[in-house]
């Protein structure tokens, strides 16, 4: 095996792609700042107990583990940054009011999510802590849509769900809650026959529960799905509140293309309220996922309402129209103080200046040199090529 090969699911980022990713990162973090979000940068590696606090087994399976040679304790390479940012809010900042935090950093997965996924993601996201009302959910969703618009994603579609719908059904039927994992998997796959088969094997599962689960698998479509859910789902405690929360968001976003999928319950064990995914034209999977997760910070000794989102910046950049090559000024190499001063002034003004090294006058790179710095009448001036 050649020593230039990388492990499966990992890849180098070459100059043109790296430039596009970095441009996006700067644009998006600047956007988040205009909303009042503060940037934080947690470490790549933490004690495993901290990384996996109040998260499901899925994150545990995705986390690469190693032994700390200083303490002997098990460390984890982060597979998601949300719990780290939650720890910062709950334990380090310890603010009483609303806190808005954003972040961007690499995460590593022990296994790829699917055949088309990378094991190393550049995760960027934003979180609001300290407000339990729908206003925080709405602000986060508005920021998501602004994020994709800034990146140039066309025809973005918002898909809404609410973990409270599933929780209301499980709370009303303890027997169903014992099989929550299997039931949620079947619901995500819209597997109505599979739900019926599982229901036939589970003793004591209520008839209302079976009907509700089978109805959930078909409750996806436009905003009218909420009204249909009110008719078809049981009026158990918590159900009306969850559907009301979805309706409030729909009513607050009249200009957004959206759908409702009450079977999108992938984060049931983690989320505590509204959840969402956003899809873009020509992408095979959701570009952004997020939602409310009020219970996670309890593991850090301070329960706080929380809602947020994250996305993979590499995946986003790879699906966008390639950026035009950067325009640059070509300059000769030399030790003339006047030339050095002219190059310095151009660079300070934001221009890219590529000085041609001796013997490499025909070299190619990612820049398009449409101007050159030339000596005219004893002065270094920029002229168009």
Swiss-Prot record:
Top-rank taxon: Bacteria
Name of one Pfam family that matches: tRNA-synt_His
Pathway: Amino-acid biosynthesis; L-histidine biosynthesis; L-histidine from 5-phospho-alpha-D-ribose 1-diphosphate: step 1/9
Annotated Gene Ontology cellular component terms: cytoplasm
Alphabetized InterPro entries for the sequence: aa-tRNA-synth_II/BPL/LPL, HisRS-like_core, HisRS/HisZ, HisZ
Disulfide topology: none
Alphabetized GO MF terms: histidine-tRNA ligase activity
GO biological process: histidyl-tRNA aminoacylation; L-histidine biosynthetic process
Record localization: Cytoplasm
UniProt KW keywords: Amino-acid biosynthesis, Cytoplasm, Histidine biosynthesis
Record note on quaternary structure: Heteromultimer composed of HisG and HisZ subunits.
Job of this protein: Required for the first step of histidine biosynthesis. May allow the feedback regulation of ATP phosphoribosyltransferase activity by histidine.
Family, as annotated: Belongs to the class-II aminoacyl-tRNA synthetase family. HisZ subfamily.
Note: This function is generally fulfilled by the C-terminal part of HisG, which is missing in some bacteria such as this one.
Protein name listed in UniProt: ATP phosphoribosyltransferase regulatory subunit
Organism per entry: Bordetella parapertussis (strain 12822 / ATCC BAA-587 / NCTC 13253)
Gene this protein is translated from: hisZ
């Amino acid at each position: 095996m050649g020593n230039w090969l990388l492990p499966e699911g990992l890849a180098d980022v070459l100059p043109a792609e790296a430039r596009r990713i970095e441009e996006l990162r700067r644009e998006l973090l600047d956007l988040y700042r205009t909303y009042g979000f503060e940037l934080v940068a947690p470490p790549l590696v933490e004690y495993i107990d901290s990384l996996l606090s109040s998260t499901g087994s899925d994150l545990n399976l995705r986390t690469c583990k190693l032994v700390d040679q200083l303490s002997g304790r098990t460390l984890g390479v982060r597979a998601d940054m949300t719990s780290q940012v939650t720890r910062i809010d709950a334990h380090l900042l310890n603010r009483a009011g609303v806190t808005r935090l954003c972040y961007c950093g690499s995460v590593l997965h022990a296994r790829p999510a699917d055949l088309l996924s990378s094991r190393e993601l550049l995760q960027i996201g934003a979180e609001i802590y300290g407000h339990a009302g729908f206003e925080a959910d709405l602000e986060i969703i508005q920021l998501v849509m602004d994020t994709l618009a800034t990146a140039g994603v066309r025809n973005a579609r918002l898909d809404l769900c609410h973990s409270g719908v599933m929780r209301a059904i499980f709370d009303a039927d303890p027997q169903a809650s014992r099989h929550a994992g299997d039931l949620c998997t079947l619901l995500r796959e819209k597997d109505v026959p599979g739900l019926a088969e599982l229901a036939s094997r589970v003793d004591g599962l209520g008839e209302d529960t079976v009907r509700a689960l089978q109805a959930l698998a078909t409750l996806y479509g436009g905003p009218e799905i909420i009204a249909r859910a009110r008719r078809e789902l049981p009026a158990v405690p918590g159900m009306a509140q969850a559907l009301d929360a979805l309706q409030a968001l729909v009513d607050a976003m009249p200009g957004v293309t959206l759908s409702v999928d009450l079977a999108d319950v992938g984060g049931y064990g983690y989320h505590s309220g509204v959840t969402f995914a956003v899809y873009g034209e020509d992408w095979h999977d959701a570009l952004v996922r997020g939602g409310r997760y009020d219970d996670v910070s309890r593991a850090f000794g301070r329960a706080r309402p929380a809602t947020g989102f994250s996305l993979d910046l590499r995946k986003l950049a790879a699906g966008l129209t390639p950026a035009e090559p950067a325009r640059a000024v070509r300059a000769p190499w030399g030790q003339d103080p006047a030339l050095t001063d002219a190059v310095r002034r151009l660079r300070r003004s934001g221009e890219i200046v590529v000085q041609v090294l001796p013997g490499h006058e025909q070299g190619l790179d990612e820049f398009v040199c449409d101007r050159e710095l030339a000596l005219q009448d004893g002065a270094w001036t920029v002229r168009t090529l």
